[in-house]
């Protein structure tokens, strides 16, 4: 399942996964009804990542084993509503991490962002382990998410994978 499937990355990821795994095996899920029509070639679920019980029921009942969690409030919008950004970005992640901890999900893919860095991070040849002082709500939530993913891996063996995306420019 790709949660947050209607966004820029989600749309392309769903199409690539359906090509690789088959249309019927990849569920596109999002809160919005106005997803790109190209996602209609396979299963679609209207899903609010903040509805913990609905997400849990869907994943367990459908036997979903891999989750790509892309649902998030991005930088500009997050700055306007920090409390909601934190809730959306963290509670959604906790829901999925807990499902994996409980044995319902085998793999989680959760993107982080270059936003975890800040003005004090070296700009050239940035090492993997370096100063991270994010200066945005989005960056703060992504940095916290990285730590939570690490915690769930170290303490519960949760298979969670992440990359830090650079700044992406919308294609629309």
Model region roles, listed by residue range:
Residues 1-20:
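N-terminal Rossmann NAD(P)H-binding glycine-rich loop of SDR-like oxidoreductase domains
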Residues 22-35:
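Conserved glycine-rich Rossmann-like NAD(P)H-binding loop of the short-chain dehydrogenase/reductase
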Residues 40-51:
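Rossmann-fold cofactor-recognition segment
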Residues 44, 85-86, 100, 108:
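A hydrophobic alpha-helix adjacent to the NAD(P)-binding/active-site core of NAD(P)-dependent oxidoreductases
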Residues 49-88:
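NAD(P)H-binding glycine-rich loop region in Rossmannoid oxidoreductase-like domains
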Residues 94-137:
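Conserved Rossmann-fold NAD(P)-dependent oxidoreductase catalytic core, especially the SDR/UDP-sugar
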Residues 113, 146-171:
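Conserved beta-loop-beta element that borders a ligand/cofactor-binding pocket
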Residues 137, 141-144:
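Active-site helix of classical SDR
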């Amino acid at each position: 399942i790709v949660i947050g499937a209607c966004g820029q990355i989600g749309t392309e990821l769903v199409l690539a996964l359906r090509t690789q795994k088959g249309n019927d095996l990849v569920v596109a899920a999002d809160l919005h009804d106005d997803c790109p029509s190209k996602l209609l070639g396979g299963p679609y679920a209207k899903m609010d990542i903040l509805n913990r019980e609905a997400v849990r029921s869907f994943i367990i009942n459908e036997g979903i084993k891999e989750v790509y969690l892309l649902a998030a409030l991005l930088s500009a919008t997050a700055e306007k509503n920090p409390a909601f950004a934190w809730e959306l970005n963290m509670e959604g992640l906790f829901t999925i991490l807990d499902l994996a901890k409980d044995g319902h999900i085998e793999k989680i893919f959760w993107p982080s962002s270059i936003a975890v860095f800040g003005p004090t991070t070296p700009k050239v040849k940035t090492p993997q382990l370096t100063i991270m002082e994010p200066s945005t709500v989005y960056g703060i939530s992504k940095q916290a998410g990285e730590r939570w993913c690490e915690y769930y891996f170290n303490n519960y063996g949760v298979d969670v994978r992440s990359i830090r995306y650079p700044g992406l420019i919308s294609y629309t």
